[in-house]
A protein has these predicted regions:
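Bacterial N-terminal signal peptides that target proteins for export
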Residues: 2-14
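Bacterial N-terminal signal peptides
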Residues: 12-23
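Pepsin/retropepsin-fold aspartyl endopeptidases
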Residues: 24-400
């Protein structure tokens, strides 16, 4: 591109590099759930403040005079991942050395990597304390760069299997209660199966029933494997963002269905789907409308939408660009074909160094997403050699 090029791209939700950590699975011989050595709560209900960034819920915690530490909550992961630095600070009985202490983990999109085993002596979330937590060690630097904030780990579903876990997306909080508590849970229960260490529920798609993973660690909305289903499309599949996974990157294919999705008593009309060849899943872009409660003692999940009205229609706002983020610059990783960005001549490899005049290091993902909610054009500054070129961008709906 030259400095005179017009760059009309997206306004709205950022089509950024999304790290799909959900769906992490262990080999079959390790699928028996391994809860922490002991879980204690300061009361019958522990409320942990949470934050939503890129459709992912994360929490912040401090204990033993150290922290704050930040963790993503990933119900789609059968393991808990932490950085080597955190494992060194709170070493447990399992140390990451010696034979047979590496495990192969398969990510949501089928790729696999080997990670060292270890354990944490203690992990606290507000008034909840977990002791002798088995973990795998993972470098969270790429995820930290994407979210624009330090990430110290990913909390998998088995960590909470001794608890009644509520992800209150609208209220930006986690609620932890004893699993034996006879609590009144809002919403309609959906039978669940956590035999493989992660929660699977049956949902309705049109006139069919479909088994899906409830995956808070996926930033997507509804990931659908169309094999054997022959879904009807209101808007046919098209290219979306470039998605980062635990084992690499893949291009996204998105579509809008012509039939509703039913979660218990909740009906989502014409849902947006991210097409996959792996297990179908409900991710953060859909779950964020609900208060989701996992009741492992009774094998059920509740979906409750606070307030009046039906679930809102799912939308996909896009800039036509995917970025790989660093504190100093954002590199264009991919351009969606047929988007305004592609028409403007933007190509992968170009570097963005400022947003609205501020260095990109000041823009975490949550702040950038809030900016994209508005209607005002956004000024991106590109670095071309030693020259800086400003471009004002707007946004479009990826799927009508």
């Amino acid at each position: 591109m030259t400095s005179g090029d017009a760059r009309r791209v997206a306004r709205g939700a950022w089509c950024a590099l999304v790290f799909l950590l959900g769906g992490c699975a262990l080999p079959p011989f390790l699928r028996e759930p391994v809860p922490p050595g002991r879980v204690t709560l300061a009361g019958t209900e522990v409320v942990v403040p949470a934050r939503l960034a890129g459709n992912l819920l994360w929490v912040e915690a401090s204990w033993e005079g150290a922290g704050p530490f930040r963790f993503l909550v990933d119900t789609g992961s059968s393991v808990t991942l932490v950085t080597p630095a955190l494992a060194q600070r709170f070493p447990g009985r399992v140390r990451p050395s010696g034979p047979n202490l590496r495990l192969r983990v398969r990510g949501a999109e089928g790729g696999a990597i080997d990670l060292p085993r270890a354990s944490l002596r203690r992990l606290e979330l507000g008034g909840a304390a977990f002791e002798e937590v088995e973990v795998l060690l993972y470098d969270c630097a790429p995820l930290s760069a994407h979210l624009g904030l330090p990430v110290d780990g990913v909390l998998g579903f088995p960590l909470f299997r001794e608890l009644l876990l509520t992800l209150d997306y609208p209220g930006s909080r986690l609620i932890l209660r004893p699993r034996t508590l006879s609590a009144v849970i809002p919403g309609q229960p959906v039978p669940a199966d956590a035999a493989l260490r992660t929660p699977l529920v049956t949902v309705g798609l049109g006139e069919r029933s479909l088994l899906v993973l409830v995956d808070s660690g996926s930033a997507a909305g509804f990931s659908l494997n169309p094999a054997g289903i022959s879904p009807r499309y209101a808007v046919p599949p098209r290219d979306g963002a470039l998605l980062g996974t635990l084992a690499g990157e893949r291009p996204q294919r998105v579509a809008r269905l012509a039939e509703p999705l039913r979660l218990g008593g909740q009906v989502i009309p014409e849902p947006v789907v991210d097409l996959t060849d792996e297990l179908s899943a409900l991710g953060g872009a859909l779950l964020r409308q609900f208060v989701v409660t996992f009741d492992p003692a009774r094998d059920r999940v509740f979906f409750h939408r606070p307030g009046e009205g039906a679930p809102v229609r799912m939308e996909v706002r896009s800039s036509g660009l995917s970025f790989t983020r660093t504190p100093a610059y954002w590199r264009v990783a991919a351009v969606i074909p047929g988007s305004p960005a592609a028409a403007a001549g933007i190509v992968p490899g170009e570097l963005v160094v400022r947003v609205n005049g501020e260095p990109v290091g000041r823009w975490d993902l949550a702040r950038f997403e809030r900016l994209l909610e508005g209607s005002e054009p956004i000024t991106l500054t590109f670095l071309e050699g030693s020259t800086e070129v400003e471009a004002r961008i707007a946004a479009f709906n990826l799927l009508p």
